[in-house]
Amino acid sequence: MLEKLKRAIAGREGPRRDGTNALRLVDGEGDGLPGVEIEDFAGRWVVQTREGGFPEWLRGVRNELKGPRAIYWKRLGEEKEAPVLVDGEEVTEPFEVIENGMRFWIDF
């Protein structure tokens, strides 16, 4: 699973070249990881799953990849629910992200 995650991330390095730091890293079945979507918001990952809780194979991935500052989890379809911190630094204030040159403020 970790290798599939690494491939998915590597395949999305192109958009980052223009300064984009908010993008989808994993798109479920399309990346060989059915039921899992991962969004990156300036180094803060939000893992979303359709069924069950946080995927156990993702525990410890923050240290393994030396990548995200924090990993959050939420169930897909629960838009009104705030994501739950799983690992890393907690977001306590809104923060800025850039997507295709546009700036947005995100508040978990």
Language-model regions, residue ranges each:
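Short, well-ordered strand-loop elements centered on a beta-strand within folded domains, enriched
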Residues: R44-T49, W105
